[in-house]
């Protein structure tokens, strides 16, 4: 296997090619990419946790340092001004020397406002990409060249196609997340609270709450019916019934995003439903291939949901086809089958059909689907089906002609378990699909 340094070298070659193309298309000389700045809480002197500009960390694995700048023109070696103040109040990261620094010119920037004296005098034809437009104006960058939509659309579109370096980083992120999931399951089995399970997860992955790529969803019992539950109860429930964990990790700026659901007991209706959702998720992944729209896989899983609702007698006296046609599967799986994954958890350009940013919206029947692209090699996506028992979504079905098909007694019995979600991260290849999550033996 090639070293990370060799993979990174080729990664930079790819980014340089994309940069040359986008600069030529939009008649720019270079791109100035800003890592970002710290922003203080309103009426306070404490900053919010720093989150780096994803377009910056696409080039360099510098994720925790604000006030850095990267100048790229697609021809010359990328130049990084690395913020290196004299500061005895805060930790100061040293000038980096790592596997990637041979491919980038690294220069110390001692003052946050010192970049102006470092840049070329003629800046009218430089594009700025970053979160602080007023900083770009202070640097005399033309307003029309600040986060230009066409440039960002182009860069976002090609971010869907991961380089070998990016795939290597994502596989490392998987390893960290899998370790966390194993530790969290053990904590659940030992009767810990959501708060303490989360601590076990963070310890196993080596993350802080501010370092994980998204807020961990640690949901016991009926909390699993809240799709993005992030409360973290300090008190363990008197009865453990179910545990849904949606939690990831980050490596060199690249995310993992995994979900598992466990039943406290191994032989009840809920446990059997968990097993069946898991089996159907794996069966769907086995069918995935390049050249097929992601939307098709979402629709196919609604057909699989219908099969499970019928098998478990949650919906009765109705064909699977009629369930899908009349959207009786909708309240049980109200979200999409997944989303693109990469530098961001919900990675960009899921709706883009070309590098000009042509948008194809999700089908009106499934408005929360986050991707409508045709799958191609090097794309990385999540596959995360679920079945939930959500009061607000089921209540409208209590009346009307379809109510008689719902087994309300069974549904009431399952509500205390909340729901089920199983999520793997997959890579599309020329001749198949790689399941990064299952390759690490996470059941």
UniProtKB/Swiss-Prot annotation:
Its EC number is 3.4.13.9. Gene3D superfamilies: Creatinase/methionine aminopeptidase superfamily, Creatinase/prolidase N-terminal domain. One of its GO terms (molecular function) is metalloexopeptidase activity. It holds the Pfam family PepQ_N. Keywords: Dipeptidase, Hydrolase, Manganese, Metal-binding, Metalloprotease, Protease. Binds 2 manganese ions per subunit. Disulfide bonds: none annotated. One of its GO terms (cellular component) is cytosol. The keyword Metal-binding applies. The keyword Hydrolase applies. Its cofactor is Mn(2+). It catalyses: Xaa-L-Pro dipeptide + H2O = an L-alpha-amino acid + L-proline. Mn(2+) 1 binds at residues 257, 339, 384, 423. Mn(2+) 2 binds at residues 246, 257, 423. It comes from the Bacteria. InterPro entries: Creatin/AminoP/Spt16_N, Creatinase/aminopeptidase-like, PepQ_N, Pept_M24, Peptidase_M24B_aminopep-P_CS, X-Pro_dipept-like, X_Pro_dipept. NCBIfam families: PRK13607.1. Splits dipeptides with a prolyl residue in the C-terminal position. Belongs to the peptidase M24B family. Bacterial-type prolidase subfamily. PANTHER family: XAA-PRO AMINOPEPTIDASE 3, XAA-PRO DIPEPTIDASE. This is Xaa-Pro dipeptidase. It comes from Salmonella paratyphi B (strain ATCC BAA-1250 / SPB7). The lineage of its organism: Bacteria, Pseudomonadati, Pseudomonadota, Gammaproteobacteria, Enterobacterales.
């Amino acid at each position: 296997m090639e070293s990370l340094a060799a993979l990174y070298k080729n990664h930079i070659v790819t980014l340089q090619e994309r940069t040359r193309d986008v600069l030529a298309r939009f008649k720019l000389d270079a791109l100035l990419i800003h890592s970002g700045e710290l922003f203080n809480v309103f009426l306070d002197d404490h900053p919010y946790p720093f989150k780096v500009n994803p377009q910056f960390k696409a080039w360099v694995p510098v994720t925790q340092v604000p006030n850095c700048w990267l100048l790229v023109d697609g021809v010359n070696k990328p130049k990084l001004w690395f913020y290196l103040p004299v500061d005895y109040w805060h930790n100061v990261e040293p000038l980096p020397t790592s596997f990637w620094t041979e491919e980038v010119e690294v220069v110390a920037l001692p003052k946050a406002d010192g970049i102006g004296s470092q840049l070329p005098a003629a800046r009218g034809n430089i594009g700025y990409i970053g979160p602080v437009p007023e900083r770009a104006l202070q640097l005399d960058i033309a307003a029309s060249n600040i986060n230009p939509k066409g440039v960002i659309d182009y860069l976002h579109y090609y971010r869907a196609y991961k380089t070998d370096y990016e795939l290597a980083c994502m596989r490392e992120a998987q390893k960290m997340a899998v370790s966390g999931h194993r530790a969290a399951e053990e904590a659940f089995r030992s009767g810990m609270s959501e708060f303490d399970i989360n601590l076990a997860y963070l310890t196993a992955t080596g993350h802080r709450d501010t370092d994980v790529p998204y807020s961990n969803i640690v949901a016991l019992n009926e909390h699993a019916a809240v799709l993005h539950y992030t409360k973290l109860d300090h008190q363990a429930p008197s009865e453990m019934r179910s545990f849904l964990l949606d939690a990831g990790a980050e490596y060199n700026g690249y995310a993992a995003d995994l979900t598992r659901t466990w039943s406290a007991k191994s032989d009840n209706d809920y446990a059997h439903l968990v097993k069946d959702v898991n089996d159907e998720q794996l069966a769907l992944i086995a069918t995935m291939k390049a050249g097929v729209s992601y939307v098709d896989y979402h629709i196919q899983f609604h057909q699989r949901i219908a099969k499970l609702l019928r098998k478990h007698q949650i919906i009765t006296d109705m064909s699977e086809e009629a369930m899908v046609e009349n959207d009786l599967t909708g309240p049980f799986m109200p979200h999409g089958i997944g989303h693109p994954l990469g530098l961001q958890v919900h990675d960009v350009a899921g709706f883009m059909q070309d590098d000009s940013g042509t948008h194809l919206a999700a089908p009106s029947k499934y408005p929360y689907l986050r991707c409508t692209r045709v799958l191609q090699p090097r794309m990385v996506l999540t596959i995360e089906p679920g079945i939930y028992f959500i009061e607000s979504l089921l209540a409208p079905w209590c009346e009307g002609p379809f109510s008689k098909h719902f087994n309300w007694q069974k549904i009431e019995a399952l509500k205390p378990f909340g729901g089920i979600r199983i999520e793997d991260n997959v890579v599309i290849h020329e001749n198949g699909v790689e399941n990064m999550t299952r390759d690490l033996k996470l059941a």
